[in-house]
């Protein structure tokens, strides 16, 4: 197997150059984000900014808790007074790496965007390490890292921050393959660390990676004779990964089981892939012209990548030293592709995904099985890179000439010499096609509302209310779609400045108490709405007058249960205090 130990052990300042290249690529592929790095956040292909704004709030909450040693981490200030509100969504504790930016700057966008660019650079670097290990070639490793940094799925989902983080997946595969090559215990330990970090950065990716490995890993384990070291290393990896994952996963599972959440089958089916989705891409190239009416998600890695992946698979299977890793990558790809179909996956008249959802904790809560497609695209890039693996090479090669020789040796050995060079340059052209076809369009950007315009009411709330007071931003969302909650996530952004608990909020799941309260306050400020808010512990109502229906605005002065405490100069934002009933003493835990 070409995944040589020395391919990753060459610690040399040259890696700084690689990181610099990936940084330039990350900035260029997300441009013009860098020009508005402290004022806007990318939305990718998201129609609205709800999810990016929610992740912006998540970055702040992790930074806020990091400053307090992560005390009360799960009791996030949303859906108050509900407990463990942060367990309702992706926690992303890895975003704490940009906590100093949050602490020293009022720009939440700056921290968010620096984290995003860092993760894209990490994708490129981790990809180059993995591909270099597979091919024993630094130049091919850089090209592979670039292709993984530009992965179509990531840039399509650029508005979903956690889905931009591939490095955990790539490093897990890298150290796992290294361990199964040489049985070094440090590789087993690092595989466990990488798996754990994968889950921390993106719960979806961590879960999908572990589930796919469960079915694909036996190919790498077959015919391994050193059972003792295999068992020891496997135990180390599992223990280390569990030690990292369980402190996050257990509270999430506990909260989920307490609320008995399961996704609606029609929702999961709607967000599952179909085979035709793998023929569609948003970017340039022949497959981008697909108009198949059945295709809904652009999941294709591109024609050039698909073609080169087939070539790499054939070349990898022909070589003894790459045969097993090629079989593993092929099975990894097939399993991920089938799982991406969700309930639509039919095998011998049965639906395997539904059976798995009954037995595997957490799978029944998965909303978007089509996200398994990211593993399909990663597998295609890795298989394509195997086209460049040398035959029986003991030393890593570092230049383009050597890469060309590796191509000729691996794929043209059985052909006449005059065809070898043509094949060599043909494959180089295909790899260039992969990069060109993967180059994304400019991402959509959401310009954050100006804080200075909101400063008066935010500062009043921060100085005139108690830290434990509960605030309701009104009106509440009336719908259930993501777009209906954009105003709510803007309110969550302002809460990062006034730091008061919110009665409303947005998350992957919603507490039942909030769902009931939401239904009860749709006619605010009628008596029922105010009484229900009061019973929920709400003391302050921040009312966006422009968003409230005109008849309801007219009701505000006549509502005896509310007293106006503050109004902005333009009259658009009012803060009301909910008056307690007679002989009622406000008490808060």
Task: Describe the predicted segments one by one.
Residues 302-338, 389:
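Hydrophobic, aromatic-rich transmembrane alpha-helices
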């Amino acid at each position: 197997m070409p995944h040589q130990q020395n391919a990753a052990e060459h610690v040399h300042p040259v890696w700084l150059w690689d990181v610099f290249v990936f940084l330039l690529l990350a900035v260029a592929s997300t441009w013009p984000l860098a020009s508005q790095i402290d004022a806007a956040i990318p939305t990718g292909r998201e129609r609205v900014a709800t999810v990016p704004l929610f992740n912006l709030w998540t970055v702040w909450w992790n930074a806020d808790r990091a400053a307090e040693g992560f005390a009360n981490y799960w009791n996030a200030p949303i859906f108050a007074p509900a407990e463990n509100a942060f367990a309702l969504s992706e926690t992303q504790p890895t975003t704490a790496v940009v906590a100093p930016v949050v602490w020293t700057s009022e720009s939440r966008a700056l921290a968010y965007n620096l984290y995003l660019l860092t993760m894209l650079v990490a994708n490129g670097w981790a990809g180059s390490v993995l591909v270099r290990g597979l091919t024993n070639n630094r130049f091919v490793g850089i090209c592979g890292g670039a292709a993984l940094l530009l992965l179509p799925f990531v840039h399509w989902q650029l508005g979903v921050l956690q889905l931009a983080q591939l490095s955990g997946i790539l490093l897990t595969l890298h150290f796992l393959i290294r361990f199964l090559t040489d049985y070094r215990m440090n590789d087993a330990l690092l595989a466990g660390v990488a798996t754990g970090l994968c889950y921390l950065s993106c719960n979806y990716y961590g879960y999908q990676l572990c589930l796919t490995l469960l079915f694909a890993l036996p190919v790498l384990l077959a015919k391994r004779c050193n059972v003792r070291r295999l068992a020891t290393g496997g135990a180390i990896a599992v223990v280390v990964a569990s030690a990292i994952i369980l402190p996050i996963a257990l509270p999430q599972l506990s909260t989920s089981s307490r609320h008995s959440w399961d996704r609606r089958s029609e929702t999961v089916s709607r967000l599952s892939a179909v085979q035709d989705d793998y023929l569609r891409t948003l970017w340039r190239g022949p497959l981008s012209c697909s108009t198949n009416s059945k295709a809904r998600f652009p999941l294709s890695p591109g024609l050039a990548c698909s073609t080169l992946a087939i070539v790499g698979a054939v070349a990898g299977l022909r070589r003894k030293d790459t045969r097993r890793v090629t079989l593993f990558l092929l099975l990894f790809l097939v399993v991920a592709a089938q799982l991406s179909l969700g309930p639509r996956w039919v095998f011998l008249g049965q639906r395997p995904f539904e059976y798995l959802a009954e037995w595997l904790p957490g799978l029944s809560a998965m909303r978007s099985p089509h996200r398994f497609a990211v593993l399909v695209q990663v597998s295609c890039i890795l298989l394509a890179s195997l086209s460049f693996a040398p035959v029986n090479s003991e030393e890593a090669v570092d230049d383009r000439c050597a890469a060309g020789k590796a191509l000729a040796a691996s794929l043209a050995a059985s052909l006449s010499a005059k065809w070898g060079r043509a094949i060599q340059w043909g494959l180089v052209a295909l790899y260039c096609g992969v990069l060109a076809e993967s180059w994304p369009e400019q991402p959509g950007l959401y310009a954050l509302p100006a804080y200075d315009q909101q400063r008066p009411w935010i500062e009043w709330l921060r100085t005139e209310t108690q830290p434990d007071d509960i605030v309701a931003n009104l009106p509440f969302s009336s719908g259930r779609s993501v777009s209906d909650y954009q105003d709510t996530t803007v309110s969550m952004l302002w809460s990062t400045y006034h730091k008061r608990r919110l009665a409303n909020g947005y998350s992957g799941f919603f507490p039942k108490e909030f769902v009931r309260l939401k239904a009860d306050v749709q006619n605010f400020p009628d008596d029922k709405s105010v009484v229900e808010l009061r019973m929920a512990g709400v003391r302050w109502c921040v009312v966006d007058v422009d968003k409230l229906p005109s008849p309801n605005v007219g009701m505000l002065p006549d509502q005896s249960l509310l007293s106006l405490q503050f109004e902005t100069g333009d009259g658009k934002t009012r803060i009301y205090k909910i008056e307690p009933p007679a002989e009622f003493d406000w008490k808060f835990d």
